[in-house]
UniProtKB/Swiss-Prot annotation:
<protein>
    <recommendedName>
        <fullName>Nucleoside diphosphate kinase</fullName>
        <ecNumber>2.7.4.6</ecNumber>
    </recommendedName>
</protein>
<dbReference type="GO" id="GO:0006228">
    <property type="term" value="P:UTP biosynthetic process"/>
</dbReference>
<feature type="binding site">
    <location>
        <position position="92"/>
    </location>
    <ligand>
        <name>ATP</name>
    </ligand>
</feature>
<dbReference type="GO" id="GO:0004550">
    <property type="term" value="F:nucleoside diphosphate kinase activity"/>
</dbReference>
<keyword id="KW-0597">Phosphoprotein</keyword>
<dbReference type="GO" id="GO:0006241">
    <property type="term" value="P:CTP biosynthetic process"/>
</dbReference>
<keyword id="KW-0418">Kinase</keyword>
<dbReference type="GO" id="GO:0005524">
    <property type="term" value="F:ATP binding"/>
</dbReference>
<keyword id="KW-0546">Nucleotide metabolism</keyword>
<feature type="binding site">
    <location>
        <position position="113"/>
    </location>
    <ligand>
        <name>ATP</name>
    </ligand>
</feature>
<feature type="binding site">
    <location>
        <position position="103"/>
    </location>
    <ligand>
        <name>ATP</name>
    </ligand>
</feature>
<keyword id="KW-0460">Magnesium</keyword>
<keyword id="KW-0547">Nucleotide-binding</keyword>
<feature type="active site" description="Pros-phosphohistidine intermediate">
    <location>
        <position position="116"/>
    </location>
</feature>
<feature type="binding site">
    <location>
        <position position="58"/>
    </location>
    <ligand>
        <name>ATP</name>
    </ligand>
</feature>
<feature type="binding site">
    <location>
        <position position="10"/>
    </location>
    <ligand>
        <name>ATP</name>
    </ligand>
</feature>
<keyword id="KW-0963">Cytoplasm</keyword>
Amino acid sequence: MKQRTLSIIKPDALKKKVVGKIIDRFESNGLEVIAMKRLHLSVKDAENFYAIHRERPFFKDLIEFMVSGPVVVMVLEGKDAVAKNRDLMGATDPKLAQKGTIRADFAESIDANAVHGSDSLENAHNEIAFFFAARDL
């Protein structure tokens, strides 16, 4: 089934200048970039986007990292986009990610792990709406 999902290329990947390589992974695996923008998240936006993690011990570090530099936010579309994106990203901890996944190839740590991807269709819908107006899609 054709779906949409949100992907964020995080500050560490932008610093390494691997944005094009990451986008190529999506496109060469059947995910089309239908909307994209580069931005610098404010603390407030990062806190609101990651509100689900507010009570977790890593929340403060996550917010600091996500506002440490620009990010690229994209809507990906394709067959089973949510699951496909998560497969392409690999495990959250790049040390556990399978060889050939985005995190295994481009991430350094569980904190600086190159990419974010929606973990469910419902969250994809909410995350896309957080960054993109319907008219932009």
